[in-house]
């Protein structure tokens, strides 16, 4: 035992060169065998070598907390704190300690909330990622089983197959060579062939083959682990961070402009005293900075990410949520996503090509060329046709099994029968099997005719071949291949696929089918699912030998308008995504295999479907834990809701910055009104506490793909902010310069105190600003009238509590240090009424802004539309053009002559493409309908009629 421990210690200290010694010495050095380790021995080694994962840097909690105070928005607040304690120390007054303490308190509160929420989000993310932890097939206690890769130890026997990411450094055992992609480690672009005895590194990907291996190094002792210590992590600035920075910079610049104007006017022109001027500058600094913005947006995404995981979509990076919200094209695999991937074979339809052979023999040969364990869907379907799965190996001894790979597209079994003769059977893609057949020229036409016959019924074809191997060795080429027969495979569509596709089209997401099957199969599936039949063979569009008949047509247009692609190879997926992105589409791509990884990485949202390989999961942004398309569409809706919350807040934040800067700047410059900085702090603290609840607000997702439109955010914020600033200016003028409020409501006048120190007027302005500022969130969060869309209960409760506190402060507070005095309940009621009256136009302003930004207002001017245009005629030309275009492009490879209407914005392009797809889908559905009711509904949808205005009666 002691000798064994010493040997393992030597392995741990890397004094033994396990990479280069003969494989038998590896077993001797690791004190293990080809039968694997026992669980007890593995546990002992785990304690010695540690877990098979890289050590994570432990970050100081305190430094992490302080980190939330180190960003541009916090710097502005910290500058305000320095101003309050240093620059404010003048004019015969002591330093502004209360403002200094208030600012520091606000910073600490915000950082604390950020720290707690991010910590919770981090724990939740860690729990989610644990579900995606890489697995390894390992031999323990004489049995193969799937275990977490983290518990592997040197001496374990593992199995590496196509699509696996190698879980640890290992030496390969006997068998056929593997193709290993080491590009992530060495930069080599082409896969490397690795045979028995060769070493494979942790982190590389198996591109072809299947082989067992013995683990020689784990965790930090692997080649990848050592390299990771030498490389510093790079901070990639994502799009979300860029948006956050842009909005923060806009707010900072707005404050800077306001402060410069105040300094220029107050001191050289108005000759104001030093200290009041500093106080006015502090008001702009403290009130204008959206200090809670990073926290609110990060928390919103973290909570949203958790909700997505509950729906079966785990986000590997939270910023994928914004891309998901903006996705307008989804390229979806047919098999397993649109269909069940539960194949069935109709034995009566099997076509036999060799004399003296019946359908049962073809089935048996196909079963022999299948796996009995770790089966894929095809193997399971074929072996399941036998009365007993053991028949597939009855009376034969397996010599060698060739697993499926994307290049050969077939499996093969070499075996010895009871007479000692060697044979080989193979099943796979008909074209590949046909290439093997010795009589290809004689049977090719019939084979293609049968394939086409199957395809017209939506059936895939599987070919079976047989040969004798007289040489008696597994490496020998063998005798001539006999083409035995063709088997039809049916993969039924999911029960919810058709409805989900219709939902997707209604959401502005154009679903394109991606299938490796024949064009006829793709079209038949598209017809059954109601997604249209405007499909093309990808090789004709993107292959090296393009179809001459479409060579002159614009390929990008055909790809953009297509409902799907057939005969797709992995490299075609990448090209399809690339061309769609070049047309400014936000493209999602589903995938499951190792060869899908490049396309998944290229796509804006790479989606690894349920049961995807490790390589596909590694390359994706979102990993599905449930099969089917409905999970993706539900994730789109949830992502849009999350994005809507973030956009609502950013518009609110910009609006508040403008209203504070413009409003208080005008009060200070026109009437020389000095609002106390401490009260702006109170507004900020109450606002931040309330606005945190927006991360769980009830929102209505956008009906179309959404994205960050900074011009819309800034324009809306400036208009809202300017309107609210003028509300405050008008209120101040009415309360200070007129007797309107005392005369109308019988409240006391504020004019007398105004000549002294503005204390009561300051309380009134504080309450007016506090109420309308927080109420604005109800306007920005809704797409229609704010009082129609019910907000989340948390937001309502937070608003009521915050404004109750604000009202009590304004009514009762007599704070000399803050220069305010209670105004009583009468004035509080007047201010609430004033804000309610001026709140109502905010919704109208919102609609006008949206209308102006959409460009439709300018379209009406340009096209000289008049008010007397009838509703049924409005847009008639566009509908007719769309109808004609859909009819022209439904069949064949015809490119559109021109765009249907002048597209002035990317938004219009997205909705147009989705609208066309909806029409093609409705045409496909029309063919399936045999009732008068269904026919009428389809025609109504196709022609864009308003069903509500048509009085019709029909019977089914």
UniProtKB/Swiss-Prot annotation:
One of its GO terms (biological process) is proton export across plasma membrane. The modification Phosphothreonine is found at residues 889, 955. GO terms for cellular component: plasma membrane. It is a multi-pass membrane protein. Residues 954-956 are annotated as: Interaction with 14-3-3 proteins. InterPro entries: ATPase_P-typ_cation-transptr_N, ATPase_P-typ_cyto_dom_N, ATPase_P-typ_P_site, ATPase_P-typ_TM_dom_sf, ATPase_P-typ_transduc_dom_A_sf, HAD-like_sf, HAD_sf, P-type_ATPase_IIIA. The active site is at 333 (4-aspartylphosphate intermediate). Its EC number is 7.1.2.1. This is ATPase 11, plasma membrane-type. It comes from Arabidopsis thaliana (Mouse-ear cress). The lineage of its organism: Eukaryota, Viridiplantae, Streptophyta, Embryophyta, Tracheophyta.
């Amino acid at each position: 035992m002691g000798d064994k421990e010493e040997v393992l210690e030597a392995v741990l200290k890397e004094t033994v060169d396990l990479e280069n010694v003969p494989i038998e010495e590896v077993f001797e050095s690791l004190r293990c065998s080809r039968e694997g380790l026992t669980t007890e021995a593995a546990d002992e080694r785990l304690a010695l070598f540690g877990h098979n994962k890289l050590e994570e840097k432990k970050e100081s909690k305190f430094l992490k907390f302080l980190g939330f105070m180190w960003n541009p928005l916090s710097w502005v607040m910290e500058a305000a704190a320095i101003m309050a304690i240093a620059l404010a120390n003048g004019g015969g007054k002591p330093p502004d300690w209360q403002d200094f303490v208030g600012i520091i308190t606000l910073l600490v509160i915000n950082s604390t909330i950020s720290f707690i929420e991010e910590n919770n989000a981090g724990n939740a993310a860690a729990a989610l990622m644990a579900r995606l932890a890489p697995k390894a097939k390992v031999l323990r206690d004489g049995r193969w089983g799937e275990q977490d890769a983290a518990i592997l130890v040197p001496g374990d026997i593992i199995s590496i197959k196509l699509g696996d990411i190698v879980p640890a450094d290992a030496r390969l055992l006997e068998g056929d060579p593997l193709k290993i992609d080491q590009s992530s480690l060495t930069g080599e672009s082409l896969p490397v062939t690795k045979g028995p005895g060769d070493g494979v590194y942790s982190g590389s990907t198996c591109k072809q083959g299947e082989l067992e291996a013995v683990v020689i190094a784990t965790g930090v002792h692997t080649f990848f682990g050592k390299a990771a210590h030498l490389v510093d992590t790079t901070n990639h600035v994502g799009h979300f961070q860029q948006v956050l920075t842009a909005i923060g910079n806009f707010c900072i610049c707005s404050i800077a402009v306001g402060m410069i104007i105040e300094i220029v006017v107050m001191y050289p022109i108005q000759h104001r005293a030093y200290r009041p001027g500093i106080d006015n500058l502090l008001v702009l600094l403290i009130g204008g900075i959206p200090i809670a913005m990073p926290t609110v947006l990060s928390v919103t995404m973290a909570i949203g990410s958790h909700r997505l995981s509950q729906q079966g979509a785990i986000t590997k990076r939270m910023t994928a949520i914004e891309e998901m919200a903006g996705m307008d094209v989804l390229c979806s695999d047919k098999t397993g996503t649109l269909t069940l991937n539960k194949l069935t074979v109709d034995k009566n339809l099997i076509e036999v090509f060799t004399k003296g052979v019946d359908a049962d023999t073809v089935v048996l040969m196909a079963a022999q060329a299948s796996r009995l364990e770790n089966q894929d869907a095809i193997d399971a379907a074929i072996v399941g046709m036998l009365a007993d799965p053991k028949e597939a190996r009855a009376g034969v001894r397996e010599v060698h099994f060739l697993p499926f790979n994307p290049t050969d597209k077939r499996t093969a079994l070499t075996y010895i029968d009871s007479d000692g003769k060697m044979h080989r059977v193979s099943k796979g893609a008909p074209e590949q099997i046909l290439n093997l057949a010795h009589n290809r020229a004689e049977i090719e036409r019939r084979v293609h005719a049968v394939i086409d016959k199957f395809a017209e019924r939506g059936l895939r074809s599987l070919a079976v071949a047989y040969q004798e191997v007289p040489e008696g060795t597994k490496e020998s080429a063998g005798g001539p291949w006999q083409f035995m027969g063709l088997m039809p495979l049916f993969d039924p569509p999911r029960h919810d696929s058709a409805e989900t596709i219709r939902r997707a089209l209604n959401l502005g997401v154009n679903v394109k089918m991606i299938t490796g099957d024949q064009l006829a199969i793709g079209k038949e599936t598209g017809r059954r699912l109601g997604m249209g039949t405007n499909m093309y063979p990808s090789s004709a569009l993107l292959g090296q030998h393009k179809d001459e008949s479409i060579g002159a047509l614009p390929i990008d247009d055909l790809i953009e308008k297509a409902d799907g692609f057939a005969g797709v190879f992995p490299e075609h997926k990448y090209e399809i995504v690339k061309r769609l992105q070049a047309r400014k589409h936000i493209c999602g791509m589903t995938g499951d295999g190792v060869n899908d990884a490049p396309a998944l990485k290229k796509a804006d949202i790479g989606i690894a479907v349920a049961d995807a390989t490790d390589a596909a999961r590694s390359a994706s942004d979102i990993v599905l834990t449930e099969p089917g398309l409905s999970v993706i569409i539900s994730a789109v809706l949830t992502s849009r809701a999350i994005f809507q919350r973030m956009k609502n807040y950013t518009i609110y934040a910009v609006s508040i910055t403008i209203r504070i800067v413009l409003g208080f700047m005008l009060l200070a410059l026109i009437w020389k009104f000095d609002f106390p900085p401490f009260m702006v702090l109170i507004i900020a603290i109450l606002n931040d506490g309330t606005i945190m609840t927006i991360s769980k607000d009830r929102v209505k997702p956008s009906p179309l793909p959404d994205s960050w439109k900074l011009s819309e955010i800034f324009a809306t914020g400036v208009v809202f902010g300017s309107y609210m600033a003028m509300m405050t200016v008008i209120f101040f003028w009415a309360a200070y310069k007129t007797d309107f409020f005392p005369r109308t409501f019988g409240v006391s006048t504020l004019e007398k105190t105004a000549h002294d120190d503005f204390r009561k007027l300051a309380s009134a302005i504080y309450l007016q600003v506090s109420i309308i500022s927080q109420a604005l969130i109800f306007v920005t969060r809704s797409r229609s009238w704010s009082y129609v869309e019910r907000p989340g209960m948390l937001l309502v409760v937070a608003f009521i509590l915050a404004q109750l506190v604000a009202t009590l402060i304004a009514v009762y507070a007599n704070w000399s240090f803050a220069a305010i005095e209670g105004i009583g309940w009468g004035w509080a009621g007047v201010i609430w009424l004033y804000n309610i009256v001026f709140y109502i136009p905010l919704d109208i302003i919102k609609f006008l802004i949206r209308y102006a930004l959409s460009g439709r207002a300018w379209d009406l001017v340009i096209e000289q539309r008049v008010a007397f245009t009838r509703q049924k005629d409005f847009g008639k030309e566009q509908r007719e053009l769309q109808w004609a275009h859909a009819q022209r492009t439904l069949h064949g490879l015809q490119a559109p002559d021109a765009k249907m209407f002048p597209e002035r914005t990317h938004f219009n392009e997205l909705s147009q493409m989705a609208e066309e797809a909806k029409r093609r889908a409705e045409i496909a559905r029309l063919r399936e309908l045999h009732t008068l009711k269904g026919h009428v509904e389809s025609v109504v949808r196709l022609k864009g009629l308003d069903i509500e205005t048509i009085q019709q009666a029909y019977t089914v």
